[in-house]
Amino acid sequence: MFTRDMNIATFDPELFEAMSNEVVRQEEHIELIASENYCSPRVLEAQGSQLTNKYAEGYPGKRYYGGCEYVDIAEQLAIDRAKELFGATYANVQPHAGSQANAAVFQALVTPGGKVLGMSLAHGGHLTHGSHVSFSGKSYEAFQYGLHPETGDIDYEELERLAVEHKPEMIIGGFSAFSGVVDWARMRTIADKVGAYFFVDMAHVAGLIAAGLYPNPVPHAHVVTTTTHKTLAGPRGGLIISGCDDEAIYKKLNSAVFPGGQGGPLMHIIAAKAVAFKEALSPEFKVYQQNVLANALAMVDVLQDRGYKVVSNGTQNHLLLLDLIDKDITGKDADAALGKAHITVNKNSVPNDPRSPFVTSGLRLGTPAITRRGFGIEETKALTGWICDILDDIENEDVSKRVQDQVKELCARFPVYQK
């Protein structure tokens, strides 16, 4: 028998302390990891709901368990809103994560051991786009394209040359650390030239796309995936959508998710996705995404004024990649120094990085989370100046302590969740 006043604090104080400390960390530290964001209390409410108790293998109206009449409604709302948000004719909201959504696409469209062509992890791609440490590089023959050394843009000529040479079954667009705008139409043309499927992982820019501020890949790709957190600011999860109007592909995708890769869906997370999609359809969400872009540009301006190199010479989305090779600072050391001052970033490889992925020569910075808590251009410029102060004198304890105090004061002015 349960009562509503049961709680973690009295039952498991050790765990509750860790959870409480994480709440404090999120409130008192500045979050600049480009893939992290804060979801709304409405999304949190759905994630903590009793829908977590319901098993619902299958799809709405076609379940293997009874008692699914209400979770069917929740999942159908999520499906319909996802399609509306991105102009798609198909949506599968069941993937537990972006990587599992990507795995389902591979399973649906590529023969075991088949050839794929994706963006190099070292140039800003993702593990699941053909990296040798991922299923995408272990179970498939993966080839990699990258950035042009002079322009910092995707090297489409190299991409086309590799596509013609290797004849991949699938070409993958999308990235985890690229600050430019992708020419989806050109990539589809290359895919058509070699008879390949064109698959886009838009996880990092899905929120910008939903707001109409970044080119939508749905009209060009056979299949598109995304996470539902990051710029979408929803729960941690995955999504597959398409506008190709090919029912055979849709059927393959559904089968690849269930039963091919997953069993029962997480109905509480699917409900949270439905909430997040409704939030993303609002006018306020577009304003938020506009501010994300404005803050990213402000960050670039300060970094370049202070003599720091930004990969691709700027940004056209929510993130930027800081190249520290000329400063002779490792990404690992920069990450640690900023973390000590309560500024959370992540070390990241840069193009032609001489250091290992465990050390790196760069930092990836993103503005979705700081914008979500209300930082504007003024606050972003001040913050970026503090970052430069630390990197200018990375072992200076006085600078670190001063910035930590400034961070604490700024965070107090802009709480993540106001009381």
Curated annotation (Swiss-Prot):
Chief location: cytoplasm
Residues where (6S)-5,6,7,8-tetrahydrofolate binds: 121, 125-127, 356-358
Spans traversing the lipid bilayer: none
Gene Ontology process terms (BP): glycine biosynthetic process from serine; tetrahydrofolate interconversion
UniProt xrefs under Pfam families: SHMT (PF00464)
Subcellular location per the Swiss-Prot or TrEMBL entry: Cytoplasm
UniProt entry keywords in alphabetical sequence: Amino-acid biosynthesis, Cytoplasm, One-carbon metabolism, Pyridoxal phosphate, Transferase
Family: Belongs to the SHMT family.
PANTHER family: SERINE HYDROXYMETHYLTRANSFERASE
NCBIfam families in the record: PRK00011.1
SUBUNIT field: Homodimer.
Record-given protein name: Serine hydroxymethyltransferase 1
Lineage of the species this protein comes from: Bacteria, Pseudomonadati, Pseudomonadota, Gammaproteobacteria, Alteromonadales
